[in-house]
């Protein structure tokens, strides 16, 4: 926090500054708040990413052989950033197991997660989630975690999921392999964590 002219408190976030004086009364202040929120969210853009899909079924095939498959449940594409830590793994593990993508027994939407519904989870490691396009429109994956530490982190993430739920309900693809991933998206329902 900084103090501007006339002693008014200013909230800063990277390049944006928000003046707290007369905040509610000014339409420009709403825009300032949105910029501040966007900027603060950008701080978390370089942490582990999950693309979670509610599925009726999903499977992973490697070299023509199905190595994992689930019925109804959640499929998560898992992207690791080069700066990810154990805290990022724990955060995403809790979010994945707690996210409420299903209705309850009364039909109320967004009330149950995989645990309440006793469903399965399929995780697929996907370093391309941190891909960006270069000026020549070619993919660049320099922000993705390198293979050896990424495999260790991914295995740790799977271990956390198995410890936080039922181990036999957590499935995964094959780290580093070329995989064919098939799914029937239920809804469709897809969120990014």
What is each PLM-predicted segment?
Residues 1-4, 39:
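Short intrinsically disordered, low-complexity coil segments enriched in acidic
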Residues 33-36:
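Short polybasic linear motifs
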Residues 143:
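An anionic oxygen-ligand recognition environment, strongly enriched in 2H phosphoesterase
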Residues 13, 39-42:
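Cysteine-centered motifs
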Residues 3, 8-9, 24, 30:
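Acidic, Ala/Val/Gly-enriched low-complexity intrinsically disordered segments
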Residues 46-136, 140, 148, 152-193:
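N-terminal, polar/charged subdomain of small-to-medium soluble alpha/beta proteins
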Residues 5, 14-22:
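Intrinsic-disorder-associated, low-complexity terminal segments enriched in Asp/Asn/His/Tyr and depleted
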């Amino acid at each position: 926090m900084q103090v501007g002219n006339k002693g008014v408190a200013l909230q800063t976030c990277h390049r944006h500054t928000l003046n707290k004086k007369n905040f509610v009364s000014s339409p420009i202040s709403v825009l300032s708040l949105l910029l501040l929120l966007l900027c603060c969210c950008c701080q978390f853009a370089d942490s582990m990413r999950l693309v979670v899909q509610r599925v009726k079924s999903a499977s992973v095939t490697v070299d023509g052989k199905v190595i994992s498959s689930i019925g109804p449940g959640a499929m998560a594409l898992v992207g690791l950033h080069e700066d990810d830590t154990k805290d990022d793994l724990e955060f995403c593990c809790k979010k994945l197991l707690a996210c409420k993508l299903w209705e309850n027994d009364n039909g109320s939407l967004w009330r149950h997660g995989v645990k309440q519904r006793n469903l399965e989870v399929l995780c697929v490691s996907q370093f391309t989630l941190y891909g960006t396009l270069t000026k020549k429109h070619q993919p660049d994956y320099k922000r993705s975690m390198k293979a050896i530490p990424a495999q260790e982190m991914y295995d740790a993430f799977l271990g956390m999921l198995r410890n936080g739920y039922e181990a036999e309900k957590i499935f995964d693809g094959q780290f580093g392999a070329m995989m064919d991933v098939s799914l029937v998206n239920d809804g469709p329902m897809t969120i990014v964590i």
